[in-house]
Design a protein with these regions (language model features):
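Short, surface-exposed "cap/lid" segments of acyl-processing enzymes
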Residues: 15, 24-56
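Accessory cap/linker subdomain of secreted extracellular hydrolases
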Residues: 152-230
Length: 299
C-alpha cells in the first residue's frame, strides 16, 4: 500500500505543489516524474487512477506528480520552462521529496506524461536531444537525461493540420462560445477543474484555435522549438501507448512519433483518448503490465 504526501515547491510563475506516492515496504528502483494531461488548458496533477499508482509503487517505482501552469494565462514556453524546472529540482534538491535517505543522490528517474503531459515530457527530453538546428539560449535544459520516457497518448506536432483545424469529434459536442475564455483566470495558475476549464478546451478544438491559446509567436518558431519535427534523436528509450481511433490525437501522430524514435509501442483498440481511465479493462491491465516490464528494462 502506498503513502501520499504533498509538498510545495518553487514555481517560476506561481506557487505550485508536488504529490509523492511511495510504497514504504518496497525497495525503490527509480522515481517516476509525472505530468498530467488536459491540452495545456485544464487538468490536475493528481489525476492518475488508483490502479496505476498501486502498480507502479508496488513494483518499486515511487511517483511524483507535479503541477505546471496552464494556458492561456501562460504560453507553451513558460509551461515548458516550468516543467524542466520541476525535473531539475528533483535532480538538485532530492531531499525535498523524501524518496531516498537524506543527503544521498537522487534515484534514477523516468518521465511520464499523459496527452499534453507527454508532449511536455518529450519536449523536455528533446532539450538535450540531437537537433537539426540550434536551440535558443533562453530555453532551459534538463541537467541529466532520464532513464526513459512513458508517453500515454502523447504527441509532438509531427503531423500537419490536426491541431490547427476544427476537430470533427469535438464539433459533435454542444457548441462552445469564445466567451467561455473570459471565465478563466488571467493570472498564472496550475489547477484547471473540468467544470470550469474543460469547456475552453472544447471551444479550442471546435474552432481550430487551440494553438493560438498557448502559442503567440511566429509559426516557424513553433515548429522549430515546440514540436519534435527537427529533433532527430532522444537521449533515452521511449514507451508510447495510443488507441487506434483516438478522438483527440490522431493515430498517425503516434505512428510518426514511434517511428522517429524507435519507441516501444502499445496499441489499444477503440476511440477513447485516455483509454486507461477504465482500469477494469483488459487493455488497461495489459498496458500497465507492459509499462512495468519496460521500466524493468531501464533500471
Amino acid at each position: 500500500m502506498y503513502t501520499m504526501n504533498t509538498i510545495s515547491i518553487k514555481g517560476r510563475f506561481c506557487v505550485k505543489s508536488a504529490t509523492i506516492y511511495k510504497n514504504p515496504d518496497v525497495i525503490s528502483r527509480a522515481c517516476i516524474l509525472y505530468f498530467h494531461g488536459g491540452g495545456l488548458l485544464y487538468g490536475y496533477r493528481c489525476d492518475l487512477p488508483e490502479a496505476h499508482l498501486e502498480q507502479f509503487t508496488s513494483a518499486g517505482f515511487p511517483l511524483i506528480a507535479f503541477d505546471y501552469p496552464l494556458a492561456p494565462a501562460c504560453d507553451v514556453k513558460d509551461i515548458l520552462q516550468d516543467v524542466i524546472d520541476s525535473v531539475n529540482t528533483y535532480l538538485t534538491e532530492p531531499d525535498l521529496f523524501q524518496i531516498t535517505v537524506p543527503g544521498s543522490n537522487p534515484l534514477p528517474y523516468v518521465l511520464f506524461g499523459r496527452s499534453s503531459g507527454a508532449y511536455l515530457t518529450l519536449l523536455s527530453v528533446a532539450s538535450i536531444g540531437k537537433h537539426d538546428f540550434s536551440m535558443p539560449d533562453d530555453l532551459p535544459t534538463l541537467k541529466k537525461a532520464p532513464a526513459g520516457v512513458l508517453s500515454y497518448y502523447g504527441y509532438g506536432f509531427l503531423e500537419d493540420l490536426w491541431y490547427e483545424n476544427p476537430s470533427h469529434y469535438y464539433q459533435t459536442l454542444p457548441t462552445m462560445s469564445e466567451a467561455i475564455l473570459d471565465s478563466l483566470p488571467s493570472e498564472p495558475h496550475t489547477e484547471g477543474p473540468l467544470d470550469t476549464h474543460y469547456s475552453a478546451y472544447v471551444y479550442a478544438r471546435q474552432s481550430g484555435k487551440w494553438k493560438s491559446l498557448f502559442y503567440h509567436d511566429r509559426e516557424k518558431y513553433f515548429l522549430l522549438y515546440y514540436s519534435l519535427r527537427l529533433c532527430s534523436e532522444l537521449p533515452c528509450p521511449v514507451f508510447c501507448a495510443h488507441s487506434t481511433g483516438d478522438t483527440d490525437v490522431p493515430f498517425a501522430e503516434f505512428q510518426k512519433l514511434t517511428e522517429k524514435y524507435h519507441a516501444i509501442r502499445f496499441i489499444a483498440s477503440g476511440s477513447q483518448h485516455d483509454f486507461d481511465r477504465d482500469t477494469d479493462s483488459a487493455q488497461t491491465k495489459e498496458l500497465l503490465k507492459e509499462t512495468i516490464t519496460f521500466l524493468h528494462t531501464l533500471i
